[in-house]
Each structure stands twice: as C-alpha cells, then as structure tokens.
C-alpha cells in the first residue's frame, strides 16, 4: 500500500463567522499524533487568504473568488503527493476544500467520491441556510451545480459526475426538504444513516464500494471525504453543529474502514 502523506488545508473560506475554528483542525490533529499513527509524511500546508463574512451579492455565496483561487493551490499540493506515488490525506478546514481535492483528481481522469457526512451539502446558494457558506453547498458545486466561479473551476465542470458519487450516512433529509434544498440527483447513490443501520455497517460499506467500483463507474478510483459531524454528538463535539443520532465510532471504524481499505491499494497515479 502507498505511504500516507498529509496535506494541511486550514481553510475556513466556506464557513460563517460563528463556525470559525475549523481552520485549526489540522494542527490539532497533528498535535494529537495523527501523522505518527499513520506513519505519514508531512507534505505541506496550503494557507487560505481573503476571508470575508459578507455574502457576495452576485452569486449569493460567501468568499466565492477566494474559494476559486484556493482550490487550484490545494489541487497542486494533492497532485504533488500523487506524483510521488503516495496516498494523500487532506486535513481541513471546512468542507469547501472538497473542490480542491476533486480538482486534483479531475485533472488526472475520472474519479468517484464517497461522501461521508451528516449532511448532503447540496443547497443552492439562494436557499443556503448558512448565509451562502460553501460548506453547505460543496457537493452541489463539485457536481457542477452553482455559479461558475465555484462550480466550473478551471473550466472542468463537473469535478465529479453525479453518478460517480455515494452520499453515505447523511441524516438531514427532513432539513433539506423543509429549507427548500434542491433534490439530490436520481443518479447519485444515497446510503443514508437509516440504511446504514438497517443494512449493518459492513453491508452498507460494501454497497458503497460495489457501486464506486462497478464496471461502468469511475475507472481511476475514488476520493473519501469524511466530515466528523457524521458521528453522534456524544462522541464528537468538535464540529460546528453537534447533533444526536449519528454513527457510533467503534462500530463504524471497525466495519466500514475494513471494506474501504481494500480499494486504497489501487494505483491513483
């Protein structure tokens, strides 16, 4: 298996002021020994600049140009890791860093996305519940839905095809409907929190892997996005919106990761 290489992405460009602090996550995780635990190389840090708490009047998105400028820089850092034959581990930051990681992969071929998150993050800007913060819309932008400045970075819309995405363990369907979120595309596979519980963690993980590795699917591999808010608030308070009824860490980690680790040995270069 390739060696892990950690890229720090301490960006809060996709967050509202009330949720600032996520940009400290990389240093906190490294201080806690993550690099040693993974025997990982530290492959650099991509700083974000230009944060503003104001919503752009044209796009209804916060910091759209800053996110558009940051994403290629992060993509370059991820590409450098891949060029070394290593396995990139990108530490955010808020969920808008997804645009940089998926941009790195879109430059190389057709990649899928396993989106493990308590929320589907698919809001259109005009109904975004976080004052246009991209962290509530990043999956929509990555699949090409939204203003060009964030949804067509480098003219590569979409960064990932809808039919190459699995949204795993989300539990926000009622909130999305109540707030008028655009519907998730029918060709995007959703394995929500209730399905994970009904199928069991191992079977749900196998379902996700089977879909992403199908013959007509993304031939070059897939990215795993993990937002800590997928976990229950009793075990994960260090998120902007701790909520009950999420995944339990031990059950999830032992059963799901074992399924996904098998595909980590694929050649992503």
Short names for language-model regions:
Residues 2-269:
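Conserved alpha-helical scaffold segments that buttress catalytic/binding sites
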